[in-house]
C-alpha cells in the first residue's frame, strides 16, 4: 500500500528521476506527490517563468569580449552537425530537393511524413530540426528549451547556410520549422534555388489551438519535453501570412488538414513532392566522397578515382 504521508515530489518522475538541479521550491510546484509532472495551469506557469529566467546556454558558452563561442563549444557544434550528415547521399542522378515544413508545434508533421513519404524521415536526407539539435546540447533537460533557444538557432542557421548546403555535395534537405515568419525563409529559398534545388513547402493546417496545447502538455507529462504555451500562442497569432507569401516562391507546395488522422491534402500548387525516393539509385554516400577527397589530397592519382565519384571531384 502506498504511504500517502510521503512527499514523492523529490523522488521519481515517470521516465526517470526528477531533475534535482531545479530548486526544491520549484520542484514542489511542478511535480505532484507521486513524482509525476503536473500540467495544470499553475505548474506550467511556474515552470515557464523559471525556465525563462535561466541564462541562455549561448551566453554561458561565448566570450564576453568577442561574442564567439569558446573553441570547445565550436567543436561540439561541429560534432552535432556531423551526426546529421554522416549518412547523407550525394545526389548524382536527379535534382536535389528541399522540403520546408510548416505548422504549429505538436501539429503532427512527423506523423504526416511517415504516412505520405516515409523516405523523408530517413538518414539519407539532411533533417534540420531544432528539437533534435537542442537535444544534443549537454544542458538540455527537456523542460528548458527556452534556455537553449539562441544556441540552437545558431546551429540551425549554420546548417541552412552556404557554409553547409552543397558542401561537399548536394543532398536532399528537410527543414522542420513552424513557418510563422518569412524572415529566414526568403534567403534560404534563394540559396537553395541558386544551388539547383527543387523547393517544396508542406504545411500542416486546421489543427485547433486548444488541441495543440493539449498534445504539447500531454507530451511534456509523458516525456518531459516542454514547449512553452507562449510559443504556441505566437504561432496562432501570426496565422498563415508567411505561408501565403512563400508558397509562390517554391516549386511546389501542399497544405494538409491535420485535424484528423487521415491528413488529407486540401490545397496544392506547382510540382508534386515525390512520394518515393530511391537513394541507392540517386547517388553515392557522402562518406565515400569525403574518403575519396582525403585520398586525393594524399596524392592518389585521377586514374584511381572511380568514375561515379569523378564528377563530384571536378574530374
Regions found by a protein language model. Give the residues of each.
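C-terminal accessory extensions appended to soluble enzyme cores
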Residues: 5-96, 249-315
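Hydrophobic positions on the alpha1 helix immediately C-terminal to the Walker A/P-loop
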Residues: 112
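The conserved Walker
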Residues: 104-105
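Short hydrophobic/aromatic beta-strand immediately N-terminal to the Walker A/P-loop
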Residues: 99-100
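Conserved nucleotide-sensing/catalytic segment adjacent to the nucleotide-binding pocket
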Residues: 122-191, 195
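Conserved glycine(s) of the Walker
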Residues: 108-109
